[in-house]
């Protein structure tokens, strides 16, 4: 953990530079690239891999057809420590969202449930609540649990692990040629945020980095809203309205934008200049991990149809700006923007201005540094 600030609010006078926070999050052990792990095995056997590990859902071609399987695994131990039901339901929501943003249709769920000693009432309650969250989310999305396993008695003299349901989701993409990828695609594309931030920094990577416990707990999950946003992104993909799609999860909106920039242009990187409206605190808008949010891009020609489609699904939607350049520049706008200047009647503050090259360096080397593998 870093030095604890007086508050989790990102206020310039408290010395919290959003760009530095973003680099710290990208390089943190929980958000950095997993390449040091997955490069140790061959994940491209039989040459069917369309999208490999490390950048959202994995995509495997089904030979002899136009179809592909799409798979994602997710877990949210930090939120599970606050609320086991929410931790499990969020994990299902994120895994299905990661499948949906490729354009694929989620088909089924598997799980690995990791808990402490169930003979202790507290641990048994955690297990019951997590299973309830898993069931509620699966019913909301109409998905069967095809199998799974349970690991109990995960304790040491220091105590039990936090409730950790690991969720896997598999889906089907009817035409692999329509695959939507997470990286920004081309200069001039319009960046659109679908969904909105809600209060709560508990369990977030930002709170962990700041070394401070969030008193307000994690943000809530509306399963109906989650189902609607996934239906929207699948329809947008089917109508060829998207040039990229990335979900907002660990690290919040700022990390989602940084990942899209880092992975942009086929991995070469592609920046953007954006303006984010602030309805809550800057910390919540940039680094809060409210679910049911997706960053999508479209050509300028298709952007109006994309925004209209989101509204037809009764989803909040806002155009943030456009793709281009070699820097990620994010301004905050609105009454909640701190350190802001007046511009045409609204408050505007520069929040993030970082080279894409620096974003990539933080993300690619963070896990190796954390594990002490830099010299390998």
Positions of predicted regions on the chain:
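Glycine/proline-enriched, intrinsically flexible loops and inter-domain linkers
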Residues: 1-376
């Amino acid at each position: 953990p870093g030095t604890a600030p007086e508050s989790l609010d990102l206020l310039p006078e408290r010395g919290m530079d959003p760009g530095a926070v973003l680099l710290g999050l990208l390089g943190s052990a929980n958000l950095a690239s997993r390449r040091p792990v997955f490069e140790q095995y061959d994940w491209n056997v039989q040459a069917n891999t369309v999208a490999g590990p490390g950048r959202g859902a994995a995509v495997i071609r089904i030979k002899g057809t136009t179809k592909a399987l799409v798979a994602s695994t997710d877990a949210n131990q930090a939120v599970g420590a606050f609320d086991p039901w929410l931790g499990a339901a969020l994990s299902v929501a994120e895994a299905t969202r990661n499948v949906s943003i490729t354009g694929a249709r989620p088909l089924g769920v598997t799980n690995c449930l990791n808990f402490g000693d169930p003979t202790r009432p507290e641990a048994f309650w955690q297990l019951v609540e997590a299973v309830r969250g898993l069931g509620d989310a699966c019913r909301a999305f109409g998905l069967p649990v095809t199998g799974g396993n349970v690991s109990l008695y995960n304790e040491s003299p220091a105590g039990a692990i936090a409730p950790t349901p690991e969720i896997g989701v598999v889906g089907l993409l009817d035409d692999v040629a329509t695959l939507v990828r997470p990286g920004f695609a081309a200069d001039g594309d319009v960046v659109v945020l679908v969904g909105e931030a809600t209060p709560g920094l508990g369990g977030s990577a930002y709170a962990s980095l700041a070394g401070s416990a969030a008193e307000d707990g994690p943000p809530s999950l509306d399963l109906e809203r989650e189902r609607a946003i996934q239906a929207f992104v699948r329809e947008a993909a089917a109508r060829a309205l998207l040039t990229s799609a990335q979900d907002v999860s660990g690290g919040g909106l700022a990390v989602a934008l940084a990942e899209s920039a880092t992975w942009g242009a086929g991995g070469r990187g592609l920046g953007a200049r954006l303006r984010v409206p602030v309805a809550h605190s800057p910390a919540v808008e940039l680094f809060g991990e409210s679910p049911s949010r997706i960053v999508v891009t479209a050509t300028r020609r298709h952007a109006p149809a994309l925004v209209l489609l989101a509204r037809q699904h009764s989803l909040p939607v806002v155009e943030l700006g456009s793709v281009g350049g070699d820097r990620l520049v994010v301004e905050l706008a609105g009454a909640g923007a701190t350190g802001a200047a007046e511009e045409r009647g609204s408050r505007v503050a520069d929040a993030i201005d970082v080279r894409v090259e620096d974003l990539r360096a933080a993300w690619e080397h963070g896990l190796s540094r954390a594990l002490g593998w830099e010299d390998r």
